[in-house]
Swiss-Prot record:
Subcellular location field: Nucleus; Chromosome
Sequence positions bearing Phosphoserine: 140, 199, 204, 226, 241, 259, 266, 371, 408-410, 421, 446-447, 461, 485, 518
One GO term describing the cellular component: nucleolus
Organism: Homo sapiens
Biased composition (Acidic residues): 481-490
Cross-link named Glycyl lysine isopeptide (Lys-Gly) (interchain with G-Cter in SUMO1), sites: K176
Protein name, as recorded: DNA repair protein XRCC1
GO biological process, one term: double-strand break repair
Low complexity bias (residue ranges): 221-231, 277-291, 427-443
Keyword presence, Translocase: no
Cited InterPro entries: BRCT_dom (IPR001357), BRCT_dom_sf (IPR036420), BRCT_XRCC1_rpt1 (IPR045080), Galactose-bd-like_sf (IPR008979), Xrcc1_N (IPR002706)
Length: 633
């Protein structure tokens, strides 16, 4: 775009003796036009063009002005104030803060055709009026560094660019601008040309290794050496990155194993890493039932099946199939992660304990669900059972992960140790007349039954529930034939001592009932021991849909109690203050930060911990207004 030349200055409202308005006519960028003194709010200058031109773009270099406006007029009509038209609306060059601090006074802005007023830009003019203003600062004079006007490009120049070299004068130096279309070296040109030349060759390079890999694979099919097969596997994939090799899981290895010759399958099985067997201690869990079934009736070491390979991703959803879990004592986000892992393994989830529930995964003892399930004889395990099953990709016996606490009883031990696979749902004991003869009939050749001790005979009772307890402990000892017999004796002795304290008054010292079990009258202990056949009580969920946040310090273990109550009544605890929080539980007095929280969320309610305790005592939702935290007068 050709630059429009300026002829002379028609008029100027204010100018400095050194930095006069004529400096705008010169090409030197260091010559400026400034006001005569500081404190003026508006100054203006009128410039005469050489001829009438259509202005296509304007370049303005600032020198301390906050706003600049450009107007155009014609000298033929007298060019009065009313004859000027706005070409460039008032544009900002400095913000108020920049004006007061004096920062960025020489900002340059280029206004193209889209920034100019179209009606004025389409006409021809020979006079330009520039108005500068600075209302924010009175400390220093202001003005312009330079102004450039450009006419529209010619059609011939747009079609065929001019080959002449333009020269820009910058102070005492002249900058020569060369045509960008000239063939010259650019930074990185040789590098990109080398890549373009070598790219066809690199595209055909993988053909060589693939052919060699196919030849090696065909020649090694007859050999049965496993090292050669591994070398083939490494040669057939030369482009595979180490990062990709690390991501190969065991499932992909199992998929590749059937494709190998049968002779290579047998030596590869023993080389798989085996998990260390758990050491047997008096507190260890019994052997899984499927291993016991293979050993029953045969000497040790015969009939044992080889270790099954770890389950792949396609079998991951069948590991805990048939298991229904209930969570207790966990907080989000770990609660949701544990639930997702259990569902990924094929288990089902229930928010509360139901008849089809099989396992209660508890974070710690003495939670409300823990006491409920313990009274119903359910199975309570630790979270490590689900985590280890997910990590090992196979179903582990849940006996190793049983919760050990003061509330455990022989009925719980019986439910946790009995069953075929060790993971079936616990069932209540059934009354059967031939219960006393079961331990003798169930004894196999691999687990010899020793004669009952006097203490066991003394512990015999006509009460059918107590006989079932003795049977459960004895059958446990039979199932654990590989364990030490001392554990079974200690367990029988402990149960016998417990039953001895509950003997009915009419029973003799030798353990025989004088009524021979013919009486229909039940004792108080029997009624107390028999679990009632009632539906599982469900906890109220009056906190459902409500979000809580614990703020500040709480004395003692009050925070843990509040978390338990809110979780038990189906409330949601937030880890941090968010828009979802509805109730803020705090033991402190009114805090100034509460007012800021109310400004962001007017529906917030600040309550005392006593509200949670009262809701637990009444087992219903009470009005929180009676327990609110209010500002002190």
């Amino acid at each position: 775009m050709p630059e429009i030349r300026l002829r002379h200055v028609v008029s100027c409202s204010s100018q400095d003796s050194t930095h006069c308005a004529e400096n705008l006519l010169k090409a030197d960028t260091y010559r400026k036009w400034r006001a005569a003194k500081a404190g003026e709010k508006t100054i203006s200058v009128v410039l005469q063009l050489e001829k009438e031109e259509q202005i296509h773009s304007v370049d303005i270099g600032n020198d301390g002005s906050a706003f600049v406006e450009v107007l155009v007029g014609s000298s033929a009509g007298g060019a009065g104030e009313q004859d000027y038209e706005v070409l460039l609306v008032t544009s900002s060059f400095m913000s108020p803060s920049e004006s007061r601090s004096g920062s960025n006074p020489n900002r340059v802005r280029m206004f193209g055709p889209d920034k100019l007023v179209r009606a004025a830009a389409e006409k021809r003019w020979d006079r330009v009026k520039i108005v500068c203003s600075q209302p924010y600062s009175k400390d220093s004079p202001f003005g312009l560094s330079f102004v450039r006007f450009h006419s529209p490009p010619d059609k011939d120049e747009a079609e065929a660019p001019s080959q002449k070299v333009t020269v820009t004068k910058l102070g005492q130096f002249r900058v020569k601008e060369e045509d960008e279309s000239a063939n010259s070296l650019r930074p990185g040109a040789l590098f990109f040309s080398r890549i373009n030349k070598t790219s066809p060759v690199t595209a055909s390079d993988p053909a060589g290794p693939s052919y060699a890999a196919a030849t090696l694979q065909a020649s090694s099919a007859a050999s049965s050496a496993s090292p050669v097969s591994r070398a083939i596997g490494s040669t057939s994939k030369p482009q595979e990155s180490p990062k990709g090799k690390r991501k190969l899981d065991l499932n992909q290895e199992e998929k590749k194993t059937p494709s190998k010759p049968p002779a290579q399958l047998s030596p590869s099985v023993p080389k798989r890493p085996k998990l260390p067997a758990p050491t047997r201690t008096p507190a260890t869990a019994p052997v899984p039932a499927r291993a016991q079934g293979a050993v029953t009736g045969k000497p040790r070491g015969e009939g044992t099946e080889p270790r099954r390979p770890r389950a792949g991703p396609e079998e991951l959803g069948k590991i805990l199939q048939g298991v229904v879990v209930v969570l207790s004592g966990f907080q989000n986000p770990f609660r949701s992660e544990l639930r997702d892992k259990a569902l990924e393994l094929g288990a089902k989830y229930r928010p509360d304990w139901t008849r089809d529930s099989t396992h209660l995964i508890c974070a710690f003892a003495n939670t409300p669900k823990y006491s409920q399930v313990l009274g119903l004889g359910g199975r309570i395990v630790r979270k490590e059972w689900v985590l280890d099953c997910h990590r090992m990709r196979r179903r582990l016996p849940s006996q190793r992960y049983l919760m050990a606490g003061p509330g455990s009883s022989s009925e719980e031990d019986e439910a946790s140790h009995s069953g075929g696979s060790g993971d079936e749902a616990p069932k209540l004991p059934q009354k059967q007349p031939q219960t006393k003869t079961k331990p003798t009939q169930a004894a196999g050749p691999s687990s010899p039954q020793k004669p009952p001790t006097p203490e066991e005979t003394k512990a015999a009772s006509p009460v059918l529930q107590e006989d079932i307890d003795i049977e459960g402990v004895q059958s446990e000892g039979q199932d654990n034939g590989a364990e030490d017999s001392g554990d079974t004796e200690d367990e029988l002795r402990r149960v016998a001592e417990q039953k001895e304290h509950r003997l009915p008054p009419g029973q003799e010292e030798n353990g025989e009932d004088p009524y021979a079990g013919s009486t229909d009258e039940n004792t108080d202990s029997e009624e107390h021991q028999e679990p009632p056949d009632l539906p599982v009580p469900e906890l109220p969920d009056f906190f459902q849909g409500k979000h809580f946040f614990l703020y500040g310090e709480f004395p003692g273990d009050e925070r843990r109690k509040l978390i338990r109550y809110v979780t038990a009544f189906n409330g949601e605890l937030e880890d941090y203050m968010s828009d979802r929080v509805q109730f803020v539980i705090t033991a402190q007095e009114w805090d100034p930060s509460f007012e800021e929280a109310l400004m962001d969320n007017p529906s917030l309610a600040f309550v005392r911990p006593r509200w949670i305790y009262s809701c637990n005592e009444k087992q219903k939702l009470l009005p929180h207004q009676l327990y609110g935290v209010v500002p002190q007068a």
